[in-house]
Swiss-Prot record:
<dbReference type="InterPro" id="IPR023028">
    <property type="entry name" value="Mannitol_1_phos_5_DH"/>
</dbReference>
<feature type="binding site">
    <location>
        <begin position="12"/>
        <end position="23"/>
    </location>
    <ligand>
        <name>NAD(+)</name>
    </ligand>
</feature>
<dbReference type="InterPro" id="IPR013118">
    <property type="entry name" value="Mannitol_DH_C"/>
</dbReference>
<dbReference type="GO" id="GO:0005829">
    <property type="term" value="C:cytosol"/>
</dbReference>
<dbReference type="InterPro" id="IPR036291">
    <property type="entry name" value="NAD(P)-bd_dom_sf"/>
</dbReference>
<dbReference type="InterPro" id="IPR000669">
    <property type="entry name" value="Mannitol_DH"/>
</dbReference>
<dbReference type="GO" id="GO:0008926">
    <property type="term" value="F:mannitol-1-phosphate 5-dehydrogenase activity"/>
</dbReference>
<protein>
    <recommendedName>
        <fullName>Mannitol-1-phosphate 5-dehydrogenase</fullName>
        <ecNumber>1.1.1.17</ecNumber>
    </recommendedName>
</protein>
<dbReference type="InterPro" id="IPR013328">
    <property type="entry name" value="6PGD_dom2"/>
</dbReference>
<dbReference type="Pfam" id="PF08125">
    <property type="entry name" value="Mannitol_dh_C"/>
</dbReference>
<dbReference type="Pfam" id="PF01232">
    <property type="entry name" value="Mannitol_dh"/>
</dbReference>
<keyword id="KW-0560">Oxidoreductase</keyword>
<dbReference type="InterPro" id="IPR008927">
    <property type="entry name" value="6-PGluconate_DH-like_C_sf"/>
</dbReference>
<dbReference type="GO" id="GO:0019592">
    <property type="term" value="P:mannitol catabolic process"/>
</dbReference>
<feature type="active site">
    <location>
        <position position="221"/>
    </location>
</feature>
<comment type="subunit">
    <text>Monomer.</text>
</comment>
<keyword id="KW-0520">NAD</keyword>
Amino acid sequence: MSQTNGTHTKKAVHFGAGNIGRGFVACFLHNSGYEVVFADVTDRTCDALNNQTSYKVIEVGAEGTEEKTITNYRAINSKTKEDELLQEIATADVVTCSVGPNILKFIAPVIAKGLDMRSEELKPAAVIACENAIGATDTLAEHIKEHLPATRVEDLSTRARFANSAIDRIVPAQDPNSGLDVKLEKFYEWVVDRTPFADHEVPSIEGIHWVDNLEPYIERKLYTVNTGHATAAYHGYNRQKRTVYDALQDREIQSEVRRALENTSKLITAKHGINPEEQQAYVRKIMTRIGNPHLEDAVERVGRAPLRKLSRKERFVGPAAELAEKGEDCSALLDAAEMALRFQNVEEDAESKELAKIMAENSAEQVVSQVCGLQPSEKLYPKMVEIVHRVQQDSMDDTE
């Protein structure tokens, strides 16, 4: 770790120099006094960051726009300069990432090597995955352990502490001419599990809310923000709406979103003991946020990666399966899932093309098992089979 005038200079290595990395995570790290070292695989992004001494984070909301200037960063291409990156990880205070849940396994080997090189004199690095997925840091930790000898796994906690997090901030597609600048909503939530740091102080990072039990925050966020956002996008896409804002101006779509959030709110309040009035206030806030006209959030961007969003622990099937087991209403979630199944062959979205292929080549039962991860013994299974069959039938009718 670098020293300045005898004083320790805090350093964070962040994997993924995309919009969330630059606009959300790095912004808070910068504001907390960290030097940020971005690790990315794109030459163009790394070169731009290294050639430009600052970029802007532009927060937009009903009350106006605020700009923040980010400085004190560097970028390393993790594909071509691994040795350099290893040294940075070995001396970092914090290692974060926003690469997408499916990419965690690819960044794990270099993080494993870097952590293994850490001096015993240093405090353990705080490793926090900032992904839209439950238990993403746990997933990353398991991948890291796969690349370490058994003896080094045993004492890994002396070199790193792994904390799950829940992040919440809407970052729309950016103007192609915006360069490194990032436009996003003013609202944010970054909740991190305090318990892995039991005998150490948590890292000092502005914007983080440290908690002892993360699950209620993760599920409330995933099953309200992500469920609501995706429901609006998929219904909007199927009705030829351009943005989520446009979709929510349609009363029928707005009603579908509210119904879906009524389904999930029933689960959230019962499961986590959250006050129903508090949850309703949260829902109202979310409806305002996803309907922010200043974000220009395209339905294709919000709907992208339908295979992941239709999976077992995700925003539709996850809560719907739990509600179905309890005999509770999950009809609006099923309607949203149907719209997601119809999100096929969308330009610049590989998963939507893969979804179309899976739907065309498999039985409804196979699709429900493969895509949704449901077992025939689960109460939701026959309902999803019926929906998949209907979507497949409609596709066949369209081709005749």
